[in-house]
Amino acid sequence: MSPSEYAREVSKRRTFAIISHPDAGKTTITEKVLLFGQAIQTAGTVKGRGSNQHAKSDWMEMEKQRGISITTSVMQFPYRECLVNLLDTPGHEDFSEDTYRTLTAVDCCLMVIDTAKGVEDRTRKLMEVTRLRDTPILTFMNKLDRDIRDPMEVLDEVESELKIACAPITWPIGCGKLFKGVYHLYKDETYLYQTGKGHTIQEVRIVKGLDNPDLDIAVGEDLAAQLREELELVQGASHEFELEAFLAGELTPVFFGTALGNFGVDHMLDGLIAWAPTPMSRKTDTREVTAAEEKFTGFVFKIQANMDPKHRDRVAFMRVVSGKYEKSMKLRQVRTGKDVVISDALTFMAGDRSHIEEAYPGDIIGLHNHGTIQIGDTFTQGEDMKFTGIPNFAPELFRRIRLRDPLKQKQLLKGLVQLSEEGAVQVFRPLTNNDLIVGAVGVLQFEVVVARLKTEYNVEAIYESVNVSTARWVECSDAKKLEEFTRKNELHLALDGGNNLAYVAPTMVNLNLTRERYPEVTFHQTREH
């Protein structure tokens, strides 16, 4: 393949994730984005929890029952001249580090806001994570077909609470029953709203020019006058769109619409294609790798068990950073130092898996994994280096896992270690007893673990409270001092799923006292994979 063909393939790629608070309409947006990309013909209406049509991106058993996305799915679809990779992240209040790690694999994010509610808690948390890497953000103000708050007020809230400048690209005309469409500030065009339900995309009527008398006829004189008045305010008070500020994560272009009504999503997608960065470079422990390099590199950011109930398999999701993946390619797994032949990588249309012949930077491919691949693994064509910035967070909640049938201890341990390698939960085995303690970022994770132990490992387990309030990974360069520390504190020490030593503290006070007592020991809140 010639360098110019390779460069063309790379420049076609856009890789993004959607971040939002639960119920802001993220799963609906995912559906509609795929619909506009023609990837699915019937956008499964998402909340029909009892019906058989489940949203294309929610496919694990528990998700199907609850109608929430728990695991991250990956979908690739064509849009205009580009190939878009969409990573769906759990939006439910209780989600895991999976979400955080997924954000390390994208080049851009779409923030979805319920315009009736404004900025909500989960959105704040996710924005903090995107901040760590200055990820560019586009914003979609959703649910304009309902009664909403004053759009100007919501923009102010985004700016003050999320510390990011807003540049409106479209502006709404009315809302709820009176929602008439949006005006595009940069094209001087009004797009009139006709509801499109399910998989019908209506032909949009366009009125050119803000002063066009046809606009008054189409939306009514009152709303047309209100629009002109609001736009004067908006243009005076808000930011102009600047590509550089957007790419630096300092400014977000804002689009208005209703995902459920299939309206406005395409304007946002057009913005994504025009402005979102092509595959970005990534740092390793030795140098920075750019997408233009011909040698293949990639990193694993997520592992998912049993994507196919018919196969007891696990799939490792790898983000391609540079080079072209080709079938039966030989790659070095840097952590183990072993060369492996990858003959059956997968591409994703959530839940449907098809084998692929090639992949380029920005693409996400799935590797079959029988326990040999871990989150954070780097694959190269021989170069020894490791991509950095894929974190393990110290859990915030802890439970003891207990068996109903004590004879299944072996299966329980196997299941928990596999789930911890997958990043679904973290496991701690105390040095002084046979307890198994699991740590998570949110309560729902414990339910997920118990449910999956039952369906995937045939182990009946229950979780109960345990006297642990926080955990820190410990490290000390002086082996003698570490040994002394271990001997004196073994009641509060445990090994995690990767056999790393961790201090499990009953209280924050205890942790702080121990820290003061052993200044030569480092207590880490995150650990690189």
From Swiss-Prot:
Q: Where in the cell is it found?
A: Cytoplasm
UniProt source species: Pectobacterium atrosepticum (strain SCRI 1043 / ATCC BAA-672)
Taxon lineage: Bacteria, Pseudomonadati, Pseudomonadota, Gammaproteobacteria, Enterobacterales
Q: Which PROSITE patterns match?
A: G_TR_1, G_TR_2
Q: GO CC: one term? A: cytosol
Checking NCBIfam families in the record gives: prfC, PRK00741.1, small_GTP
**Hey, which family's this protein in?**
Belongs to the TRAFAC class translation factor GTPase superfamily. Classic translation factor GTPase family. PrfC subfamily.
Stated role: Increases the formation of ribosomal termination complexes and stimulates activities of RF-1 and RF-2. It binds guanine nucleotides and has strong preference for UGA stop codons. It may interact directly with the ribosome. The stimulation of RF-1 and RF-2 is significantly reduced by GTP and GDP, but not by GMP.
For the keyword Glycoprotein, the answer is no
Keyword Nucleotide-binding included in the entry's annotation: yes
Domain (tr-type G): give its ranges. Answer: 11-280
PANTHER family assigned to the protein according to its UniProt record, in alphabetical order: PEPTIDE CHAIN RELEASE FACTOR RF3
Protein name in the entry? Peptide chain release factor 3
InterPro entries assigned: EF-G-like_DII, EFG_III/V, G_TR_CS, P-loop_NTPase, PrfC, RF3_C, RF3_dom_3_sf, RF3_GTP-bd
